[in-house]
Amino acid sequence: MAKLLAMILAGGEGRRLDPLTRDRAKPAVPFGGRYRIVDFVLSNMANSGILKMKVVVQYKSESLNTHVQRAWRLTSLLNQYVELVPAQMRVGPKWFEGSADAIYQNLNIITDEEPDFTFVFGADHVYRMDARQMLEFHLDRKAELTVAAVPIPVQEASEFGIIEVDADGRMIGFVEKPQSAPKTIPGDPTRCLASMGNYLFSTDALVQEIVRDAGDPSSAHDFGKSIVASMYQRKRVYVYDFARNVVPGQTERERGYWRDVGSIDAYFQANMDLVAVDPVFSLYNDEWPIFTVQYNYPPAKFVFNNESDHRVGRATDSLVSEGCIISGSHVHHSILSPKVRVNSYATVDESIVFENVNIGRHCRIRRAIIDKHVDIPAHTTIGYDHEKDRKHFHVTESGIVIIPKGMRIEAGR
């Protein structure tokens, strides 16, 4: 049986997710109520039976470190692990200078473990994937590198690294964020193949390419721009079409679902994908669960049923986590993390509320993201007057209001 190792790149700063990433790395941003973004790649590896994972961290990693240590305790008796790898400056007094450099500075991990194949996956996307199927494709093609790719509309090509393939799936071209005339999928002029930032290497090839790149002073030391763009011209590089990946318990509608949540708007929409009656991405797949930390909180509670007084505790088309109290208020099309309290006569609509937030009486909240440890005074209105909101909060062009972690909001604002 082949020896497998997963190197998870989780050091991303996530500037486009500011202010959610002011105090945490992008993979540590909460998602779907009770998860962190990093849980999706780790769950995919665990469900695929790949149980040796190194999580490479750097930027503001305390929150991420704490989460991984609490949530991802595999058994050392069977030599299974999820271990954090901080920047150690093993090759000199410098931080990681790119995704490829993050692997180069930790090559000792790979050479010590001696895997036959090494997965190098990002930690900032939302999806389900059976990585074993990618391995089977890699072996079948006798590839030295396999790049996972997802079909996207031609109109979105400028946001991704776009791959050109031949009829057998071998990479014959790669352009990072093309601004015009992107190469399309053979036989389908309406779609392109976008790199997912997930790679599978035959380990000998990985070591050779990483060392080669490290010795090039002109390199950006980035997997897409540097490793992939160079390697496909010299070695056997194939492209695995993620749309062909089949996960147990997955609906046909969910197949091929993959979201880059690197911007506020994309992050918001991916969360909203979860709350429909028939969601395009379901958290309720017991055959391929998303694992996370288990909280010791009581169940969610809904109190008051005074219809005549409009004081009814209810939530519709929403995800409400453990420890929440919906007290005579209405939550609709929203996601609440643990220990959120929504007090009487308040309404929360199409919003994402992080842990330990208190929403006062008669508040009206719409299309907002509220970070942790925020107390919203009674009668506060957010999301209904963007000009007013911009004086106090961050508001995106699409009208999403973000309230940073721990922000103090004055009564009568």
UniProtKB/Swiss-Prot annotation:
Enzyme class: transferase
Protein name stated in the entry: Glucose-1-phosphate adenylyltransferase
PANTHER family for the chain: GLUCOSE-1-PHOSPHATE ADENYLYLTRANSFERASE (PTHR43523:SF2), GLUCOSE-1-PHOSPHATE ADENYLYLTRANSFERASE-RELATED (PTHR43523)
Pfam families in UniProt: Hexapep_GlmU, NTP_transferase
Sequence positions that bind alpha-D-glucose 1-phosphate: 161, 176-177, 195
EC number: 2.7.7.27
Job description of the protein: Involved in the biosynthesis of ADP-glucose, a building block required for the elongation reactions to produce glycogen. Catalyzes the reaction between ATP and alpha-D-glucose 1-phosphate (G1P) to produce pyrophosphate and ADP-Glc.
Gene3D superfamilies: Hexapeptide repeat proteins (2.160.10.10), Spore Coat Polysaccharide Biosynthesis Protein SpsA, Chain A (3.90.550.10)
Family (UniProt): Belongs to the bacterial/plant glucose-1-phosphate adenylyltransferase family.
Species of provenance: Anaeromyxobacter dehalogenans (strain 2CP-1 / ATCC BAA-258)
Catalytic activity: alpha-D-glucose 1-phosphate + ATP + H(+) = ADP-alpha-D-glucose + diphosphate
One annotated GO biological process: glycogen biosynthetic process
GO molecular-function term, one example from the UniProt record: ATP binding
